[in-house]
Amino acid sequence: MIEITEFIKKYMTALDQAFPDRVWFAGLQGSYGRGEATEASDIDMVVILDQLSASDIRTYDAMLDTLPCRELICGFLSGRQELENWEPSELFQFCRDTTPIRGSLDQVLSSVTSADIARAIKSGACGVYHGCVHNMLYEKSEDILKGLYKSASFVLQAVHFQRTGVYVRHMADLVSALPPEESAVLQTFMELKNGGAVVFDAMSEQLFSWAGKWAGAPGMMDTE
């Protein structure tokens, strides 16, 4: 597995050389950011420049080619103005799941309202519902099912925050804080992430049932 501290040092040195005095924010998302990485985990880097051009994208691409484990590097690259005016319902999870390396997203996060979080929950659950039905009928893919459980885990983080005002970043902590049905969904996600066997029909039905309760509710379900 990657020694992430050493990787970040090399990454930030290369970033500053590629974009001197232009990095407004840099951070780490995903499993490495949460301390939950496995051998298969991507390195999800977040970079917000003062502004972003097509030429900057090419420069960043060339910079990544100089780094170790290039095939594992992914993430988010944007200009500051674009991020500050992003769809607010998408900013909740984005900001909460990002560990700052340089700068802060607090100002961006402060613009996110309870209604934005509710919209993120509804949209996320609807996406999981549609994906689950589609996969049960057509692709019948274990990998797609795993991805849908991952998406559901993010929705559950938002649901718990909307109920309690507490963002639980680590899934192992969140699973014990949720009601039984939601906890079971998250437990399945954690088992799959750790290499557990896919029981396609049962796991698809579990996810379909949970997501359908949110997708089928008029407006937003009461999270109390």
Q: Where on the chain are the PLM-derived regions?
A:
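Conserved nucleotidyltransferase catalytic core and NTase-mimicking acidic/glycine-rich helix/loop elements
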Residues: 9, 104, 110-224
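Ordered, amphipathic secondary-structure segments that act as subunit-interaction surfaces
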Residues: 84-107
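Helical scaffold of the NTase/Pol beta-like nucleotidyltransferase catalytic core
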Residues: 1-25, 185, 218, 222-224
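Short, polar/flexible loop-turn hinges at active-site or ligand-entry regions and domain interfaces
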Residues: 49, 55, 102-112
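Metal-dependent nucleotidyltransferase catalytic core
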Residues: 1-18, 34-40, 46-88
